[in-house]
Amino acid sequence: MRVELFPFQKRALADIRMKTAEAMGSYHRTHAPQVVSFTAPTGAGKTIIMSALIEAILFGDEQYMEQPDAIIVWLSDSPQLNEQSKQKIDSKADKIKLSQCVTVSEESFDKEVFEDGHVYFLNTQKLSVTSKLTKNGDGRTYTIWETLANTVREKSDRLYFIIDEAHRGMQGREASKATTIMQKFIKGSDSDGIPPMPVVIGMSATTQRFNALVEGTSSTIHKSIVTTDEVRASGLLKDRIVITYPEEGTVNNDMAILQAAADEWKEKWEH
């Protein structure tokens, strides 16, 4: 990693790495789908922790051997969020090459299986019934559902499916549709011909949101939680922000500084 993780982030990374390895082992012993639930408050740097996890899976660490043929699929509900996550991985995870990160495109993606050693970015809009990815024809050999099902069948020992439930771009009815699509990967979908993903890593800001996502599943759930107190102790979260109202002549300059600081904070820690 190009950045030094905070102590609580290192603890979370070690915990998620252990539980992900346990989940993969359990799946191959029992063939029961596994879910690793990673919950951390907004501002904890969840995407940075997940970037470090992907790097650890692909290149190994002190506890686990490298798995260079691992396949990671990252699902969110927004192409913009996918792009932000992809850029975060590129800028923070120095061992992962940009060429390993692939945005699944409606126009050009058509594969029997996902390729080893890559991180694929999907969003729920591309999985709707109207999406070209979900339909045969127009020169397409494989639908995205067929690609997923084939990969589970042939490469279940190295497939990790990340659901980014923490950063939601959709609201209202569209958010509900996105949740329904996300649940297909946890529960499977007979109508789409896909089984549950072997190992799902769910990233969420609250336990309530994640519980809603996994409601009704039979998957074994492994939980990893970062508390607000841990993040606050690191200095990333503040108890209070004091705002004063200066004389009119100084307002514009001060607000410009405040806006710049807020923009920098958002860029570093929102994802």
Region roles according to the model:
Residues A212-H271:
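Conserved interdomain linker/interface between the two RecA-like ATPase lobes of SF2 helicase motors
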Residues I48-A52, Y64-K97, Q125-K126:
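Conserved Walker A/P-loop ATP-binding site and its immediately adjacent core
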Residues V3-A32, N123:
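N-terminal pre-P-loop "Q-motif" helix
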Residues Y27-L53:
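Walker A/P-loop
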Residues S78, L122-K126, E165, M203-T207:
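A short beta-strand-to-loop transition that corresponds to the Sensor-1 phosphate-sensing loop
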Residues V3-I16, T42-A52, L81-N82, G172-A178, ...:
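Phosphate/oxyanion-binding active-site loops and adjacent basic polyanion-contact surfaces
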Residues Q171-S234:
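Post-DEXD/H (motif II) to motif III coupling segment of the RecA-like Helicase ATP-binding lobe
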